Amino acid sequence: MANALAQFGNDLHSGRKSFGFVALRARLLSFALLLVVLAVLVPVVKGGFNLGIEFRGGSEFTVSQVANADVAVGEKAIIEAAPEASDVRVTNIAEGTIRAQMGQLSDDQTLAVGQALQDAYAVKADQVTSSFVGPTWGAGVTQQALIGLVWFIVLVMIGMALYFRTWKMSVSAIAGLLFTIITTVGLYALVGFEITPSAIIGFLTVLSYSLYDTVVVFDKIRENTAGLANRYDSTFGEQVNLAVNQTLVRSINTSIVGILPVGSILFIGSLLLGAGTLKDLSLALFVGIIIGTLGTLFVAAPAYAALRLGE
């Protein structure tokens, strides 16, 4: 099996085998554009994203040292103590620890829910804590993230243009990055994954990975097309396609190397420790790394070829 994969990689590098990324550029870019449009429409059709309490605001309770960590017990206790409570979410965030989130409660309702959770899980009063999270905190995080995203894109455009000495690679790289972030967020909206500050951090981190993957491919393209004007053995499109195929195995291997530890963290965070910061961050990274690789291969490289082939 290993020898077969090694031979496959050698065949791609030598050009004996290849995938027609450049020849299929129109279809690939059209499909990518369709995915972006759908990713934008999904939250509109579904009525928005599944936002964490940091963004929507509300009351939060944490019950520690729980013997029976059944979330249904907590949900029933909350509904009975405060029937007016909206958007009730009870989750396991660690072994023996329950977190309950809901819309903002009054002082009397907060006391009633706290007592109900204490009785339902048979814990002491000091093992139940409550807090109120205002939506302004999440709004501030979102604003800072958007500002960071804009600066990231601007700096990437300038840096790529200077490094590769062509604005067309810069624009193509940004197209791949935008595809990555928009489709990742759209997938979150489609599946209903909760968007928390940790997920936002994961989204921004994925952009760095996607950019690295794109730079590797573009470096190979620049190497293959250097001095092509004085050569007659191949066309520009053929050399771009060869470069993408030569770096294909590396891109896939890099993705796998990144996904394996992130997947392990996701498994530990979700199945063993329950919902929480670890799960939110690793889920965003897991989804984003996969989409980021596709963005490089199916968007950035074909877009650059499309911009240059018309010259």
Task: Give each language-model segment a name.
Residues 1-311:
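A structural signal for conserved, well-ordered secondary-structure elements
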